[in-house]
Amino acid sequence: MIFKRQIQSEIQKKMDSGKIILLIGPRQVGKTTLIKTLLSESDYLFLDGDETTVQAILETANTEVLRNLTSNYDCVFIDEAQRIKEIALKLKIMHDQLNIQKLIVSGSSAFELNSLMQEPLTGRKWTFHLHPITWLEFEQEVGYLKSEQVLEQVLITGLYPEILKNPYPLFTNLLKHSKKKGC
C-alpha cells in the first residue's frame, strides 16, 4: 500500500524549477518511496548515501568526477545525503557547474540542522518536510469506515507507513516487552 502524500503535488510543481529539491524528515516516513514515485517515469541516477562506496566517491569527487558520474542523466537523486561529508559543496558544484536538470536530495531531519548545508545552498534549493502519514492521507487511502475501525490501533502505533502495512510485528514486540516488565 503506497499512500498518496499531500506534499507530493507541491514537490512536483517545483521539480522543473532548476533548484535543488531537498526532502527532509524522520526515518521511515517514506521519503525515498515518495521521490521514487515522483521519478517513476524518469531516467535518473540513484545514489544511496548509506552505501560506503557512494560516500567515498562523493566525498573525494572533484568537478570532473562529478561530471563523469552524472553526465548521462538529467536527474540525480541522492538518498540519505546527511551521511556524505561535504555534501553541501558537492550539491553546489552539481547545481552551478553541471547541467543537471533535476537534483533531488533526501535526508534525516538532522541533515537540515547542519549549518554547513545552509550557506552553500542559499537560493539554490526548495526545502520540503515529510512527516508521518496524516489522518487525512490515511483516510483517503483506506476509506472512512476502515480508518475508524483501526483508530485505536493507529493511536498506539502512529501513522508510519511500514507499521501501517504490517503492524503485527510491532504488537508482538510490545506484548513481549510488556510481559518482561511485568505490565
Show the residue positions of the predicted features.
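N-terminal pre-Walker A segment at the start of P-loop NTPase domains
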Residues: M1-D16
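Hydrophobic anchor at the beta1->P-loop junction of P-loop NTPases
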Residues: L23
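Conserved lysine of the Walker
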Residues: K31
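Hydrophobic positions on the alpha1 helix immediately C-terminal to the Walker A/P-loop
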Residues: L34, L38
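Short glycine-rich substrate-engagement loop in P-loop NTPases that contacts/grips substrate
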Residues: L45-C75
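Conserved catalytic/switch belt of AAA+ P-loop NTPases
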Residues: A88-F111, Q118-P120
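Interdomain hinge/linker elements that couple catalytic modules in large macromolecular machines
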Residues: H131-C183
